């Protein structure tokens, strides 16, 4: 359990074996993010299409930074994989460039991951005086904050889990929703996500309709993931989406108010538009890279977009899909293998070795 007592010597050792991994493109708020990292951990920046201003900021930054870069702009899964391959640290703490850590959070999350392989902190969503900013904060709280999941940030995990969840950190094909797919494999392996509510990060306020662009991209990722079989596909898509959206909007109105539910309805439209856009146009040109085993995993009761919790039937269907793709993901019977006294020396998995060579 993450609440088990851990000595300070073990925590210091854990900090020395931790890397904060941040995917970065053109967000200059990365300066505030780095400034909030109040421990001597490795800081890994995984660049994907960086702007000149970002490159200048990195070159002039006083703290040591490990920098890697991918050509696939906007591919968060590939960026995180490159970041993981660029470091040999045992514990990977995923963070976003538009967020900052509260004091002491890095240490708290390292302490927790020493006795729990995956630990999730809490996001505090900022808001401005604008109505859309306030509604965005309420919707984000509802959509990501009312259940425990492996959606990042902030998320820290022991890289030893990778060999137990299919041999890879994140799916590079789906571009978006990469943390959602990661969460599904954790459930297949029976690896729990421990929630640490006191580990708070602050998300910068979002303005205008920027959040709709994010949900559109999530929809594209959903479309790719359904085609490759790492997400389930509803057997009757239109009816399922109508049912799932109606139920979710009722819950949103109950928990966050009618205004938030109305805005969430627009986000749902953006999400499903993104899925249709992928079906028609393949905007990331990924279909040529699908494995030969790629096929839809159809179910009558598909996985809701709002939650990552899998039913027993959904677990069986996804386990079968991974097995058909050549990945056997079995339940881990002894989680103590991930404890700091049993982890052994820090080292990368075979998948990490391959990605390091690619980098």
What are these regions (language model features)?
Residues 175-182:
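Acidic donor-binding loop at a coil-to-helix junction in glycosyltransferase catalytic cores
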Residues 195-213, 222-226:
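Active-site donor/metal-binding and catalytic loop motifs
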Residues 47-56, 96-100:
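A conserved acidic beta->alpha catalytic loop
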Residues 70-87:
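Glycine-rich, basic loop-to-helix element that forms the pyrophosphate-binding segment
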Residues 214-221, 231-359:
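Non-catalytic, C-terminal membrane-associated alpha-helical segments of glycosyltransferases
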Residues 92:
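Short aromatic/hydrophobic "clamp" motif used to bind/position activated sugar donors
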Residues 26-39:
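Short, well-formed alpha-helical segments that are part of the catalytic scaffolds
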Residues 104-131:
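Conserved donor NDP-sugar-binding/catalytic core segment of glycosyltransferases
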């Amino acid at each position: 359990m993450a609440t088990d007592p851990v000595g300070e010597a073990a925590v210091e050792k854990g900090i020395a074996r931790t890397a904060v991994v941040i995917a970065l493109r053109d967000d200059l708020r990365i300066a505030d993010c780095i400034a909030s990292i109040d421990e001597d951990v490795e800081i890994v920046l995984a660049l994907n299409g960086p702007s000149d201003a970002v490159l200048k900021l990195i070159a002039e930054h006083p703290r040591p930074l490990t920098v890697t870069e991918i050509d696939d702009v906007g591919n968060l899964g590939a960026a995180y994989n490159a970041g993981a391959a660029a470091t040999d640290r045992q514990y990977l703490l995923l963070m976003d460039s538009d967020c900052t850590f509260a004091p002491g959070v890095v240490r708290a999350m390292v302490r927790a991951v020493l006795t729990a392989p995956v630990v999730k902190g809490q996001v505090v969503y900022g808001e401005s005086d604008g109505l859309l900013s306030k509604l965005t904060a309420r919707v984000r709280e509802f959509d990501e904050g009312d259940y425990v999941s492996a959606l990042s940030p902030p998320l820290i995990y022991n890289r030893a889990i990778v060999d137990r969840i299919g041999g890879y950190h994140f799916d590079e094909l789906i571009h978006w929703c990469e943390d959602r797919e990661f969460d599904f494999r954790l459930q297949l392996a029976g690896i729990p996500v421990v929630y640490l509510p006191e580990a708070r990060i602050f998300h910068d306020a979002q303005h205008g309709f920027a959040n709709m662009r994010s949900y559109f991209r999530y929809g594209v990722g959903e479309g790719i993931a359904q085609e490759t079989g790492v997400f389930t596909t509803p057997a009757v898509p239109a009816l399922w989406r109508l049912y799932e959206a109606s139920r979710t909007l009722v819950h949103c109105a109950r928990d966050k108010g009618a205004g938030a539910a109305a805005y969430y309805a627009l986000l749902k439209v953006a999400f499903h538009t993104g899925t249709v856009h992928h079906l028609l146009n393949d905007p990331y040109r990924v279909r040529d890279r699908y494995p030969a085993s790629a096929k839809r995993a159809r179910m009558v009761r598909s996985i809701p977009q709002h939650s990552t919790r899998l039913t027993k039937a959904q677990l069986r269907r996804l386990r079968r899909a991974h097995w058909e793709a050549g990945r056997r993901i079995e339940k881990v019977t002894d989680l103590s293998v991930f404890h700091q006294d049993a982890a052994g020396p820090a080292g990368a998995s075979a998948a990490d070795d391959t990605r390091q060579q690619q980098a």
